[in-house]
Design a protein with these regions (language model features):
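Acidic, Mg2+-coordinating active-site environments of NTP-dependent enzymes
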Residues: 1-123
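ATP-dependent carboxylate-amine ligase
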Residues: 88-96, 101-111, 115-248
Length: 248
């Protein structure tokens, strides 16, 4: 905010205990316009996510920006990104309808819970950047449908129990590929998850998911492993996943 003026906008997270009073100080000193966003509560002034809706509030009056079911992006962290980007665009004078259209059409950054397409009522997501269990946990947490999950790859000596426990009833089948498939299967069984299918390669895994999925399900590539056992990079793994999905 140091180089901003009252013509500018500073967008801050209302739930951050440091940023909230910082914003109040900026407003009191009339240094810059401040807009808060929140994913935990409705705001009287600001932009917030609640009950599947992103709303903009001014002086207690609210307007619906978008329902999150209409977004291709998934996950609370992405809804927060949408709120910040929308606040900045609206401040810059972009019409509400244009902002709404863009956020509904934006499919995300490549290989990061990237929406690929929907076939026969099944949505496909590419999270090839989920190269470790912590990153892959965010991938599964973002899913809002019963999910068939493709995991496995190069062994970076990770442990997988915490990732599998994060499935939290969402995962119908875990389809495993790569060097770690036996290690992950053992970890899964140790925490009570037994719906495991082994595949020889990514192409076969995609076909298995297609055959097992029901309309309303999601298929997610979020391997929790690096790609170097079968691929040059996570980017190549993600591109091949998309190619195999589109060829179904």
């Amino acid at each position: 905010s140091e180089n901003q003026t009252m013509d500018d906008l500073c967008v801050l997270n209302y739930e951050d205990e440091i940023l909230r009073p910082f914003g109040e100080k900026l407003m009191a000193e009339k240094k810059v316009q401040v807009m808060y966003f929140s994913s935990l509560r409705a705001l009287k002034d600001g932009i917030y996510y609640q009950d599947g809706e992103i709303r903009i509030a001014k002086n207690g009056e609210t307007e619906l920006l978008a329902r999150t079911d209409d977004l291709k992006l998934l996950g609370l962290h992405n809804f927060e990104n949408v709120m910040v980007a929308s606040a900045m665009a609206l401040h810059a004078g972009v019409p509400m309808e244009t902002v709404r259209k863009v956020i509904q059409e934006f499919a995300g950054v490549e290989h990061r819970i990237e929406y690929v397409c929907e076939k026969d009522g099944v949505a496909y997501y590419n999270d090839s950047k989920g190269t470790n269990p912590d990153a892959a946990i965010k991938g599964i947490q973002a899913m809002n449908r019963p999910t068939l999950l493709i995991g496995g790859g190069y062994d970076k000596q990770s442990t997988y129990e915490e990732w599998i426990q994060a499935f939290n009833g969402k995962v119908r089948f875990l389809v495993l590929i790569g060097d770690t498939k036996e290690k992950i299967a053992k970890a899964a069984r140790s925490v009570g998850f037994n719906d495991i299918i082994m595949a020889d390669n990514l192409k076969e895994a995609v076909q298995i998911c297609h055959d097992k999925a029901n309309a309303g399900d999601a298929v997610l590539l979020s391997p929790a492993c690096a790609s170097w056992d079968q691929f040059k990079s996570y980017e190549q793994r993600g591109e091949l996943f998309k190619e195999y999905v589109r060829a179904l």
